[in-house]
């Protein structure tokens, strides 16, 4: 059985790349889910920028956000939780970068609870100006805020 000391910690370059890839994948999936609403919003973009037209468009954007924000955040949490938990610690972005998330205590796959906690805290890190991600640059195991609290670490495969 491996310990964390036996495994190579993933580089920040690989982690950032997997983050970007995952966000692109999630954005494409969300675009497909919300296609009709997005097309309606694009069609509502004013061609003449009058104050009234801009105000109407801003209102439509607020409605879209208020109706769908919880669904969007839930989708991101489900994507990260399920793949980290059931796909050998790898989201699609991590798979492409050949890295995975493991439990810091035993170097095994994360439990459902730890994967869920990590996914929720990842959203918190994003909402707080990505500060939770920056801490990885200063910690020996390159753990982010969500890694530290979920007791996980990202390693090379």
Segments the model singles out, each with a brief description of its role:
Residues 1-130, 156-157:
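Short, small/hydrophobic-residue-rich motifs at membrane-helix boundaries and re-entrant hairpins
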Residues 133-157:
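Hydrophobic alpha-helical transmembrane segments and immediately flanking/interface helices
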């Amino acid at each position: 059985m491996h310990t964390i000391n036996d495994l190579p910690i993933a580089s920040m370059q690989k982690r950032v790349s997997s983050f970007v890839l995952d966000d692109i994948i999630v954005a494409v999936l969300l675009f497909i889910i919300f296609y009709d609403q997005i097309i309606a919003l694009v069609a509502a973009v004013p061609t003449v920028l009058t104050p009234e037209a801009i105000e109407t468009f801003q209102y439509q954007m607020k409605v879209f956000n208020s109706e769908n924000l919880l669904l969007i955040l839930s989708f991101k949490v489900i994507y990260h939780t399920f793949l980290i938990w059931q796909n050998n610690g790898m989201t699609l972005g991590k798979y492409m970068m050949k890295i995975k998330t493991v439990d810091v205590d035993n170097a095994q796959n994360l439990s459902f609870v730890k994967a869920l906690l990590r996914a929720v805290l990842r959203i918190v890190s994003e909402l707080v100006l990505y500060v939770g991600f920056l801490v990885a640059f200063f910690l020996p195991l390159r753990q982010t805020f969500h890694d530290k609290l979920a007791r996980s670490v990202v390693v090379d495969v």
